[in-house]
């Protein structure tokens, strides 16, 4: 669930009135890391690929990025495209290239978002804590964003790798994050998707700078405007976003959630699905009772509470966070935080990967009754009976079955479904991407997913079985598989039994009745 975000707009209905589009999670732009040996698969000019609107998105002539850069290994893959390492031909300098497939931008809204992302990165160019954009290019098939390569990895990866942690270290981290928030706000930008995955270290050096990336959901601040787009990622979204009336204060809330996780290893709000997380966020009850909170300083808890204040008008500002005694006054102690916090953080990260895999494999075993009308919907869209649907067929289906599927849901399918990046969605990808409707956290569905992964039916998922499934569903590299096994296998026998599997599926999302966190 941590690797999902939503983007929804108010739209006009046929009668001219405004209707709300429901909250439906969709996948964020850049997701799991992939092996070094994978090479870019840029669509060949010889392969005809349909683009709905022949006009350019960036408003400038098409350019072949390969005239200026050689594209190397794949760094990450998301709903809209792929990020590669690239080398500038003229200088030999190394950058990252985010290639966004135009065929996945199914609406004018999506195209505007890409333009806004580029404009915001250009606007913030030169700011030390912001990933620098080098240039943007467009060809018939993709929009390419060339930007600074941050080789130091994600925030949580660095913290976990260090193996030790303190409040003083957490204070330094949150200062860097809120520095970014202040820079954005002073320059008239709301980020709207602050989360640990979007903070990268510039290099592997110990003193490397922490930088913010991914402005795909960001917006320019307009004086007096009340924002209504439901955007962000479930664990980190502010309550006023869910109420569809907010401003720049939402970034402080998200930073507060990150601080809470830094101090205890788990998010402050969880439930058994995304909708349940939203309910808990709206309740806004913060737990400072369970371990390790009794040993966390009062000053740290005071700052968390002020950053997670429900009323945005009363919430602390970025400038006030930076002046808080825990940040500026040296009140954050250097005493190491309990090692279980790092353990929980690792499990929280691994849980997201395993849940994503389980959703995909569960789609295979859903009954006709559980799938309800989705099979018919897929068949109606698959007009040539090829067993797959293209984005154009998906759009046509939207027009023909408007009462059955909203444009937001189609965008969700586009960004979340096409696992192998081949430009089409097969039946099980389609079902998997809509499975949030079917309460698949229930034990019966968890058991079905476990059985699917347990190929030899011996009651355990082995490393080979997990590796096979993760690669089959386009999710696995060696590091990801090793991480999931090590975090789920609580009895250290090298295998995952059903109880371990079920516990991980509920980790970080099911509110415990006792006084224990879901991660131990």
From Swiss-Prot:
<feature type="binding site">
    <location>
        <position position="465"/>
    </location>
    <ligand>
        <name>Ca(2+) 3</name>
    </ligand>
</feature>
<dbReference type="InterPro" id="IPR011992">
    <property type="entry name" value="EF-hand-dom_pair"/>
</dbReference>
<keyword id="KW-0067">ATP-binding</keyword>
<dbReference type="InterPro" id="IPR018247">
    <property type="entry name" value="EF_Hand_1_Ca_BS"/>
</dbReference>
<feature type="binding site">
    <location>
        <position position="420"/>
    </location>
    <ligand>
        <name>Ca(2+) 2</name>
    </ligand>
</feature>
<feature type="binding site">
    <location>
        <position position="458"/>
    </location>
    <ligand>
        <name>Ca(2+) 3</name>
    </ligand>
</feature>
<feature type="binding site">
    <location>
        <position position="418"/>
    </location>
    <ligand>
        <name>Ca(2+) 2</name>
    </ligand>
</feature>
<dbReference type="GO" id="GO:0004672">
    <property type="term" value="F:protein kinase activity"/>
</dbReference>
<feature type="binding site">
    <location>
        <position position="422"/>
    </location>
    <ligand>
        <name>Ca(2+) 2</name>
    </ligand>
</feature>
<feature type="domain" description="EF-hand 3">
    <location>
        <begin position="441"/>
        <end position="476"/>
    </location>
</feature>
<dbReference type="InterPro" id="IPR008271">
    <property type="entry name" value="Ser/Thr_kinase_AS"/>
</dbReference>
<feature type="binding site">
    <location>
        <position position="98"/>
    </location>
    <ligand>
        <name>ATP</name>
    </ligand>
</feature>
<feature type="binding site">
    <location>
        <position position="493"/>
    </location>
    <ligand>
        <name>Ca(2+) 4</name>
    </ligand>
</feature>
<feature type="region of interest" description="Disordered">
    <location>
        <begin position="1"/>
        <end position="21"/>
    </location>
</feature>
<feature type="lipid moiety-binding region" description="N-myristoyl glycine">
    <location>
        <position position="2"/>
    </location>
</feature>
<feature type="domain" description="EF-hand 1">
    <location>
        <begin position="369"/>
        <end position="404"/>
    </location>
</feature>
<dbReference type="GO" id="GO:0005524">
    <property type="term" value="F:ATP binding"/>
</dbReference>
<keyword id="KW-0519">Myristate</keyword>
<feature type="binding site">
    <location>
        <position position="495"/>
    </location>
    <ligand>
        <name>Ca(2+) 4</name>
    </ligand>
</feature>
<feature type="binding site">
    <location>
        <position position="460"/>
    </location>
    <ligand>
        <name>Ca(2+) 3</name>
    </ligand>
</feature>
<dbReference type="GO" id="GO:0005509">
    <property type="term" value="F:calcium ion binding"/>
</dbReference>
<dbReference type="Pfam" id="PF00069">
    <property type="entry name" value="Pkinase"/>
</dbReference>
<feature type="active site" description="Proton acceptor">
    <location>
        <position position="193"/>
    </location>
</feature>
<feature type="binding site">
    <location>
        <position position="456"/>
    </location>
    <ligand>
        <name>Ca(2+) 3</name>
    </ligand>
</feature>
<protein>
    <recommendedName>
        <fullName>Calcium-dependent protein kinase 23</fullName>
        <ecNumber>2.7.11.1</ecNumber>
    </recommendedName>
</protein>
<feature type="binding site">
    <location>
        <position position="491"/>
    </location>
    <ligand>
        <name>Ca(2+) 4</name>
    </ligand>
</feature>
<keyword id="KW-0808">Transferase</keyword>
<feature type="binding site">
    <location>
        <position position="388"/>
    </location>
    <ligand>
        <name>Ca(2+) 1</name>
    </ligand>
</feature>
<keyword id="KW-0418">Kinase</keyword>
<feature type="binding site">
    <location>
        <position position="386"/>
    </location>
    <ligand>
        <name>Ca(2+) 1</name>
    </ligand>
</feature>
<keyword id="KW-0449">Lipoprotein</keyword>
<feature type="binding site">
    <location>
        <position position="424"/>
    </location>
    <ligand>
        <name>Ca(2+) 2</name>
    </ligand>
</feature>
<feature type="binding site">
    <location>
        <position position="382"/>
    </location>
    <ligand>
        <name>Ca(2+) 1</name>
    </ligand>
</feature>
<comment type="subunit">
    <text>Interacts with SLAC1 and ABI1.</text>
</comment>
<dbReference type="Pfam" id="PF13499">
    <property type="entry name" value="EF-hand_7"/>
</dbReference>
<feature type="binding site">
    <location>
        <position position="500"/>
    </location>
    <ligand>
        <name>Ca(2+) 4</name>
    </ligand>
</feature>
<dbReference type="GO" id="GO:0016020">
    <property type="term" value="C:membrane"/>
</dbReference>
<keyword id="KW-0472">Membrane</keyword>
<feature type="binding site">
    <location>
        <position position="384"/>
    </location>
    <ligand>
        <name>Ca(2+) 1</name>
    </ligand>
</feature>
<keyword id="KW-0723">Serine/threonine-protein kinase</keyword>
<dbReference type="InterPro" id="IPR050205">
    <property type="entry name" value="CDPK_Ser/Thr_kinases"/>
</dbReference>
<keyword id="KW-0597">Phosphoprotein</keyword>
């Amino acid at each position: 669930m941590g690797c999902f975000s939503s983007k929804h707009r108010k739209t006009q209905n046929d009668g001219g009135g405004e209707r709300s589009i429901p909250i439906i999670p969709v996948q964020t732009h850049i997701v799991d890391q992939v092996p070094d040996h994978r090479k870019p698969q840029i669509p060949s000019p010889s392969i005809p690929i349909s683009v709905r609107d022949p006009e350019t998105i960036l408003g400038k002539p098409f350019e072949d990025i390969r005239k200026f850069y050689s594209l190397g290994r794949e760094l990450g893959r998301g709903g809209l495209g792929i990020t590669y390492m690239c080398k500038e031909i003229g200088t030999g300098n190394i950058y990252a290239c985010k290639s966004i497939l135009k065929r996945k931008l199914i609406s004018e809204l999506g195209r505007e978002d890409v333009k806004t992302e580029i404009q915001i990165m250009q606007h913030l160019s030169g700011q030390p804590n912001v990933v620098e954009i080098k240039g943007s290019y467009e060809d018939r098939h993709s929009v390419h964003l060339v930007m600074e390569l941050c080789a130091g990895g994600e925030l949580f990866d660095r913290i976990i790798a260090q193996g030790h942690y303190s409040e003083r270290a957490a204070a330094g981290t949150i200062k860097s994050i809120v520095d970014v928030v202040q820079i954005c706000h002073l320059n008239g930008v709301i980020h709207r998707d602050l989360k640990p995955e979007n903070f990268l270290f510039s290099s592997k050096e110990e003193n490397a700078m922490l930088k913010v990336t991914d402005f795909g959901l960001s917006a320019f601040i307009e004086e007096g405007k009340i924002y209504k787009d439901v955007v962000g990622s479930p664990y980190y979204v502010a309550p006023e976003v869910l109420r569809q009336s907010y401003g720049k204060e939402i970034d402080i809330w998200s930073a507060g959630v990150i601080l809470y996780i830094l101090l205890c290893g788990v998010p402050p709000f969880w439930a058994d699905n995304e909708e349940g997380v939203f309910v808990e966020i709206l309740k806004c009850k913060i737990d400072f009772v369970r371990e390790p909170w009794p040993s966390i300083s009062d000053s740290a808890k005071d700052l968390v509470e002020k950053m997670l204040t429900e009323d945005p008008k009363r919430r602390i500002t970025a400038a006030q966070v930076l002046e808080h005694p825990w940040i500026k006054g040296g009140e954050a102690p250097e005493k190491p935080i309990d090692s279980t916090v790092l353990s929980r953080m690792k499990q929280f990260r691994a849980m997201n990967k395993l849940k994503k895999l389980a959703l995909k494999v569960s789609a295979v075993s859903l009954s006709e009754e559980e799938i309800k009308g989705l099979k018919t919907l897929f068949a109606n869209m698959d007009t040539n009976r090829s067993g797959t649907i293209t984005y154009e067929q998906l759009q046509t289906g939207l027009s023909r079955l408007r009462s059955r599927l909203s444009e937001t849901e189609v965008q969700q399918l586009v960004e979340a479904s096409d696992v192998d990046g081949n430009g089409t969605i097969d039946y099980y990808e389609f079902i998997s991407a809509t499975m949030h409707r079917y309460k698949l956290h229930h034990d019966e569905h968890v058991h079905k997913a476990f059985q699917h992964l347990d190929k030899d039916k011996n009651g355990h998922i082995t490393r080979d079985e997990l590796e096979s499934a993760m690669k089959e569903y386009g999710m696995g590299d060696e590091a990801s598989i090793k991480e999931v096994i090590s975090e789920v296998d609580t009895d250290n026998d090298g295998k995952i039994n059903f109880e371990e599997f079920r516990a991980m599926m509920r980790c970080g999302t099911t509110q415990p009745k006792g006084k224990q966190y879901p991660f131990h």
